[in-house]
């Protein structure tokens, strides 16, 4: 029997956890790269819009919730760039969520939501040089037809 997935629920202020693990991973990656000939390397990190797709029971609005997530992720984004890597923002949600939302939003509602996600991401990237960031938009991967791509 497969384990039951538990929905995430935000019940308090969002903070970044895992700085030590992140630093260890960045140091290990840097060490591994020291043994090969590369000009530059990137480290992927998830977009704020992909985190916290569960229930928000703490923040007053969806926008407050998303911006709190973005602020927490700024810690990770900055650490990646400070370690000398290019930061790759992975954001499958921009493309894949359109046909998964229930109830299905209008195109105007979807664009408004995605604009808010972009604004939150821009807040998280504030102060990080543009030439140290790349954005990866994909259509996600799931076991079903991609009818809305």
Q: For the regions a protein language model found, what residue spans apply to each?
A:
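Domain-level signal for soluble alpha/beta catalytic cores
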Residues: 1-149
């Amino acid at each position: 029997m497969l384990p039951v997935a538990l929905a995430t629920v935000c019940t308090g202020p969002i903070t970044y956890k895992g700085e030590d693990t992140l630093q260890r991973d960045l140091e290990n990656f840097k060490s591994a790269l020291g043994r090969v000939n590369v000009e530059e390397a990137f480290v992927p990190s998830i977009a704020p819009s992909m985190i916290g797709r569960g229930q928000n029971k703490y923040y007053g609005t969806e926008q407050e919730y998303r911006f709190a997530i973005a602020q927490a992720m700024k810690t990770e984004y900055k650490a990646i760039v400070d370690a000398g890597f290019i930061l790759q923002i992975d954001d499958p949600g921009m493309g894949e969520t359109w046909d998964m939302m229930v109830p299905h939003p209008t195109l105007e509602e979807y664009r408004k939501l995605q604009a808010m996600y972009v604004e939150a991401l821009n807040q998280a990237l504030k102060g990080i040089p543009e030439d140290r960031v790349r954005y990866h938009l994909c259509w996600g991967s799931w076991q079903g037809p991609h009818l809305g791509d």
